[in-house]
Amino acid sequence: VTIAEVLKESGYHTYMAGKWHLGMHGEEKWPLQRGFERFYGILAGACSYLRPSGGRGLTLDNTKLPVPEAPYYTTDAFTDYAIRFVDEQKDDKPFFLYLAFNAPHWPLQAKEEDIQKFTKIYREKGWDEIREARRKRMTKLGIIEPNTEFAEWENRKWNELTEQEKDKVAYRMAVYAAQVHCVDYNVRKLLDYLKKNRKLDNTLVMFLSDNGACAEPYAELGGGKVSEINDPACSVFPSYGRAWAQVSNTPFRKYKCRSYEGGISTPLIVSWKSNLKNKKGEWCRVPGYLPDIMPTILEATGATYPETYHGGNRIYPLVGSSLFPAIQKKTDSLHEYMYWEHQNNRAIRWGNWKAIRDEKGKEWELYDVVKDRTERNNLAEQHPEVLTKLVAEWEKWANANFVLPKHPKK
C-alpha cells in the first residue's frame, strides 16, 4: 500500500508531480490507481528535461500528453503543476504532495544562464581542490567529524588530465551543478507559495534523495558525448562520470547502486514550523532509512496503516519506525538492524557495525561506521563473530523478503 493510498483513506487530498518510476506498463500501476488524485510527470525513470517524448514522455492524470513546446524544463514544470494542484483545491481538507524531481539524474541538460554560473569554478579548481574544500566545509558545519578521512579515490588527479579533458569534464560538472541549482530555486518557489497562502507553518516538509550520486556508466570522464549535452532528443546519457560522482559523495566511498556509504547515505531535511519550531537548525545523527518515511507520516497525520487493502487482500505489515523520537532527541536508536540490497549489492547495519557484500567483492566486509564512516578499514578478520552474526541476519531477512537474484521466491 502506498502513502497516498493510506492518506486518501484518511481524508487527505493527494497530489503528485514529477518522476513516478514505479510501473508504467499497465494503467493499474500508474499514480491515480495507487492513491493519487492528480498527477503530472513522467512514468519512466528518466527523460529529456527539454522535450520529454515517447515512452519517457509526459502524463497528466491518466492521459498521455503531446511533446511540450520549447521553452520547457521539467524541474520548472513539475513545480508549477505541484503548486497548481494545491492552489486548485477548493476545500479545507489537508493535502499530501509528493514532488519528485528527475533532477539531477542524467541526461545532462540545464538552462544556459544557470550553467554559466558554475563553469569557471569547476574549470579553475578541478576535482581535487573542490573535494578538499567540501570536506573542510562539511567539517565546519558539523556534518562530519574533524578526523574523517577521504574514502579511496578511483580516478586520476586533476593535474594528470589534458587541458582538453579538463575543459570537457568541467563543463559536465557545471551542467550538473546547474541542474541542482534549478532544484534549489524551485523548492524555494514552492515554499514561498505555501508561506504566502498561510499553509507553510502547518505543513510537514521532508526533503531527501533516494541514493548517492550516480557514476553511471562508471567512466571517469562521464558517459555520452559533450556535444550531446542539452540535446532535447537525449533522454539517457550524457552524464558527469565517476570522478565527479565521488566528489558529490565527499567524503564517502563509491556511489549509487553500491551499498557503501556513497551509495546509500543521503541527508534528510525536515521542517514543520508549528510542531518542530524548537528544533530549528538542529542535527539528528540517529540512522534511519526510507522505510521510516511511511510511519513518520502516519504519526504526523494520525492515519492508520491497514491490515487489508485492494479488495480485502491481506498486505505486508508496516516496516520501519517513525523518525520523530530521533528528531525530538528521545532515542539514539530507531532500529536493531537495517538492511539493504540493490543489484546484488548487500549490506546490514547493527549499531556501529556495518557488513557489506559488494557486487565486485568475493567476501563480506565489516566496518565500524561510527569510527570509520568512509569504510577504509575492513575489520572482518579482527571480528569474525560479528561478521558471522550479521551475515546470518541478512540471509534471514533476504529469505523472508524474497530478495533477488540470490533468493528467488519459492
What are the residue ranges of the model-derived segments?
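Formylglycine-dependent sulfatase
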Residues: 1-365, 369-410
